[in-house]
Amino acid sequence: MAGGYIARVNMKGHYLSWSSDNTYPWQNIQPTQNTKLLGLQDIGFTTDPVRRLRQHNSEIGGGAVRTTRAKGSWDMAAIVYGFPNKVAALRFEWAWQHPLKSRRLRDAVRSDLPASRAAQMQLTAKLHTLAAMLYTVPWSDQPLTLCWLQPDIADKWSNIWQRHCQCQSALPPFLTTRSGNLQDPLFQLNNAAAAASTIQRAALAADHHAWRLAAAAQAQAPDFFTGLGRLDLAAPSVEESGAGPHPSSCSVPPSTGSSAAPTPGALAPQPTKQNKFGVDPRLDSDDRDDNHQFESPDNHEAAAVNVDVVDDSADDGTTDGNEDGPDDVAPHQEVTARHVHGAIGETCGHCHQSVYQELCIVCLNATCTYRAHLLCAAQAAVHPLGQSSPSETRLVPLRHSCPRCAHQAHWASWIAEVTL
């Protein structure tokens, strides 16, 4: 399912589904006829739980190959969502599937898992693993929500969860548990909402594109335009885009030396200089990419500037139990530059200086807009009140608290977003 970006509908998370002989009215699933397959479970990642369940039951094509080969009907049991990005969500999925291979989980779950491989694949063992994961860093520091879709599995989970809670000193501070079903609007991703979101992303990207052009023109940086000569510089109007302000209404911070507005000729692409390889040596690796994209200031996802509507309905966003290791997540690292470098107009939460194109950290809470310089956040974490004690010799922070939403987490969890 989906989790991190709840407000945008385009969410991400995990599901635990299993083959059942029960029929639930909201899913219209027929009882399975193969009794040998009862209790079979599957763990995966998806951005659309409803579509993913239909793929498991062979109602639509695409994905879920291992679970559609005459393996009966499937029901969705639980969904975990609220991850800061897809990389964190996919790491959660891999650790849930391979707890004894995960460096974070192997010691925590070794005493709860049975010795045989077949018993480790049963639903009870997977629930024990999930309970241990929710007490393990970094997932214990993330604002996750565990939604149970089936009452009988929720009752079994309650007994397992109470056993784990008795062995711990405190509950996970940010965990939320609730019950629901797939008819919840949170889990619905219809075509109309997806199309509206895509149009808005394209309009915001065009606005941001024009904003950067105007700012660079006032700063008299002709080299900036050299790398943009291959892009369509025309931004859509309000009537064409249907969302977002017109680029002409974007305010540009004044620059020193000249207060005149940029002339139309200043926005024209400058002639390029090529070396013996046919490449402009003044361009960095991002500017040399013909598919270079600009990111929206209000969106964590990048959208192409010269595309009005991007059809992402064909992107399933699902996996079927890949065998990547705990650190081998290169195919899934889709974190954009916004997670590492600040955008125009963003300021540090401590020194209140601009973080535009500077290395910064972001809040792990997906709904918080906190940004801070790495050094400023580290100093605030070491000395929360801004005053150093003569006996304070610690140089590396242990925990950090967001000054906006009060979200607390280990320093390693904060710095992981910068070092991905």
Curated annotation (Swiss-Prot):
Its main location: nucleus. Residues 247-266 have a biased composition (Low complexity). It comes from the Eukaryota. One of its GO terms (cellular component) is Slx1-Slx4 complex. It is found in: Nucleus. Residues 279-301 have a biased composition (Basic and acidic residues). The keyword Nucleus applies. PROSITE patterns: GIY_YIG. Residues 311-327 have a biased composition (Acidic residues). A zinc finger (SLX1-type) spans 348-405. Residues 237-306, 311-330 are annotated as: Disordered. Its EC number is 3.1.-.-. Its cofactor is a divalent metal cation. Belongs to the SLX1 family. Forms a heterodimer with a member of the SLX4 family. Catalytic subunit of a heterodimeric structure-specific endonuclease that resolves DNA secondary structures generated during DNA repair and recombination. Has endonuclease activity towards branched DNA substrates, introducing single-strand cuts in duplex DNA close to junctions with ss-DNA. This is Structure-specific endonuclease subunit SLX1 homolog. It comes from Monosiga brevicollis.
